[in-house]
Amino acid sequence: GKESIWIPAVAMYPNTTNGCADLAQVELSNGPEIKTLDFDKDSDENAQFAVAFPKSWNEGTVTFQAFFTADSTNTGTVSWALSGVAIADNDSCNTAFGTAVAPTAKAHSGTANDLDVTAESGAVTIAGSPSTDEEVYFQITRDVSADSLTADAKLLGIKIFFTTDAANDA
């Protein structure tokens, strides 16, 4: 069946080249403090993270939703794209990501620090030969050519959806 895994911004890191800003902690006047990775409005920026999927994963495509905010009253859209690559034991870590896939760009609400959640993306094909007992690296990108928010997009995390073909990992 369909399962999900939450990847918070605190589990991601900016790329060395064209990376987003380092993790920031935002203190709001009420409610939780939030931790974000801030992606610039002027150029595509990236962050990466890794997942070791359970043995019950069917080794197929994944989909995702991005959770983000902006400390702006702008109502522009934000476009997030995800790509992935599976690396097996004794494989080179220097392997290219698959094709990035983006859901429809999501408009910010126009209220500073409101939570925005994208629609679920189309299928993201993971490069390499995905299998269990492999590490899958992902790259999340703000694609500024496909969005219109004139402020930093503050990524809170993403939810990855994957399909299982077994009841457990036994």
Residue ranges and their predicted role:
Residues 60-70, 78, 158:
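A short beta-strand element within beta-rich, extracytoplasmic domains
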